[in-house]
């Protein structure tokens, strides 16, 4: 795993290890998901076996003891810059929102890396921070409910999956 022991710095000089943080993306249909669903360079996982967890950033940033960092590109990318909590109010200006929301990225390396900007959260995430789940089919939704999922579950095969 390339990120497990990778040491980085925020633009303000705070050192951290990317492997100590749980990465979340800001939108759907990431290049990594494409590779996982197609089996490019990794073990193939079918869409029915992938569930998105949608986490409340507000809950995280409003918890004083919660450590988080965000990047403006994929965390292992050479072009990524990292920002600490003091920059959270600037997030809309620091991230390339058009690239993040784009579904066309294969012919543009920079767009592909910027699409994969990350919100990195240190430590475990309380289950009540999960606002909803997104899954591929009604069958998967029913399975999640059967497993005890209490949060909102959205079925979104075209928006969220390849």
Task: Label each PLM-derived region with a short phrase.
Residues 1-162:
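Active-site-proximal loop/hinge segments that shape catalytic or ion-binding/gating pockets
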